[in-house]
Swiss-Prot record:
The gene is INO80E. Keywords: Coiled coil, DNA damage, DNA recombination, DNA repair, Isopeptide bond, Nucleus, Transcription, Transcription regulation, Ubl conjugation. Residues 63-236 are annotated as: Disordered. Signal peptide: none annotated. Its main location: nucleus. This is INO80 complex subunit E. One of its GO terms (biological process) is positive regulation of telomere maintenance in response to DNA damage. It is found in: Nucleus. It comes from Homo sapiens (Human). Residues 157-171 have a biased composition (Basic residues). Residues 10-54 form a coiled coil.
Amino acid sequence: MNGPADGEVDYKKKYRNLKRKLKFLIYEHECFQEELRKAQRKLLKVSRDKSFLLDRLLQYENVDEDSSDSDATASSDNSETEGTPKLSDTPAPKRKRSPPLGGAPSPSSLSLPPSTGFPLQASGVPSPYLSSLASSRYPPFPSDYLALQLPEPSPLRPKREKRPRLPRKLKMAVGPPDCPVGGPLTFPGRGSGAGVGTTLTPLPPPKMPPPTILSTVPRQMFSDAGSGDDALDGDDDLVIDIPE
C-alpha cells in the first residue's frame, strides 16, 4: 500500500520541479532576448560608424588624388620651365648676310622724305634758319607804329551806344472790358541807367471783339416775374458766377 502513495508523491514533486524549471527557462529566455536587443543596437551603431568612416576616407582619398595631380602638373611645369632656358642657352646659328644688291633699296632709303624739302637734322643741333630768326639782324619796329597798330587793351570795356528801339506792337490778351488798355508802359532800361525806367508812348487801343462775358447781370434774372415756359423754372440751386 505504500507503493501507490509513494508514486503519487513522486508525480507531485516532478510537476513542481518541471514547473520550476519552466519558470527558470522563461526567465533565461527574457534575459537572452534583452541581450540580443543590446547586441543589435551595438551592431547598428557600428555599421553607422563604419559608413561614416568610409565616407571620410573617400574624401581624403579624393583630396590626395587632387594634390597628386597638382604636384604632377607643377612638376611638369617646372620641367618645362627648366627646359626652356636650356634651349635658350644654346646659341642660334648665325645666318650669313648676303651682300646688298645694287637694285635693292636699303632700309634707310625707305624712310619717307620730309614734306618741307629740307634735310632732317638731329634734334639737339639747332637749324641755321631758327638761329637766324633768333639773331637780331632786323631792327625792331618803331614804338609809334606799334602804338597805332596795337592799342593797349583798356581794363574796362567801352560802353556801346544803344540805338533807340522802335515801339513794338504788343499782343494784348482778350479780357473783360474793365481792364485798362491805354496808359504809359514802363520797361526797365539797360546799361548805365539800369535803375531808371524808360517810358514808351501809349499805343492806340486795338480793335477788340465784343466781350462774351457780361459785366452786369440782366435785370430779368433778379425779377420774380418770368415766362412760365422757362426751362430753368424750379431750379433753386442754380449758381451764377458774376465777374467782379
